[in-house]
From Swiss-Prot:
SUPFAM superfamilies with a match to the protein in the record: Nucleic acid-binding proteins, RuvA domain 2-like
InterPro entries according to UniProt: Hlx-hairpin-Hlx_DNA-bd_motif (IPR003583), NA-bd_OB-fold (IPR012340), RuvA (IPR000085), RuvA_2-like (IPR010994)
Protein name: Holliday junction branch migration complex subunit RuvA
Secretion signal, residue range per the UniProt entry: none
Length: 186
């Protein structure tokens, strides 16, 4: 697979970039936020991602390698497709996304139309595990869900639970997180 191509951008429509390289034409889905950095009728370097769904190859072109890498990470999460990945990447820049993922800011992901609580948590957990080696165990997920039902903010719970040792049982873990949450709100 190619990491990137550098070719003549000869057409852009609502969905695709059309790039010619060595007398071959390539068509890429693209982020609308990349439009400002693309130059029509000039050579453009585009970072490539490929997704195969039901034996259909889809090619994606990105102006930024880090954004392309985040896209690949997102579409490899179960139930997250290109539309959800594009929605996230078009609404936040790279640094904002890293902050959102690092700090477990599900509230920011939930602001996007069509993304519910389960999906937002799945995205945050998966990206944290991949980028920051933060794995949320089933035990911690049960505590998070319980405290959310009691009305606590997911982002506050995450800030605390990420750094807690796995050795505690669910009751002790819940008590500890509740205690820490009380300090946050005082």
């Amino acid at each position: 697979m190619n990491d990137y191509i550098n070719g003549l951008l000869h057409k852009i429509d609502d969905k695709y970039l059309y790039i010619e390289l060595n007398n071959s034409g390539y068509r890429f889905l693209y982020l609308k936020t990349d439009l400002k950095d693309l130059k029509l009728n000039q050579n453009n370097q585009v970072y490539v991602a490929i997704n195969v769904i039901d034996n259909v190859f889809k090619y994606y072109g990105f102006k930024n390698q880090l954004i392309r890498d985040l896209f690949e990470l997102l579409i490899n999460i179960n139930t997250i497709g290109e539309k959800t990945a594009f929605l996230i990447l078009e609404n936040y820049n790279y640094n904002e996304l890293i902050d959102i993922f690092k700090n477990g800011r599900t509230d920011k992901i939930l602001q996007l139309k069509g993304i519910g609580n389960y999906t937002a948590r799945l995205i945050i957990n998966s990206v944290q595990k991949e980028l920051f080696n933060n794995k949320i165990s089933d035990k911690k997920n049960k505590v998070i869900t319980s405290l959310e039902k009691l009305g606590y903010k997911t982002k506050d719970i995450y800030k605390i639970i990420i750094n807690i040792d796995e050795d505690m049982n669910i009751e002790d873990l819940t008590k500890y997180v509740l205690e820490q949450l009380s300090y946050l709100h005082n």
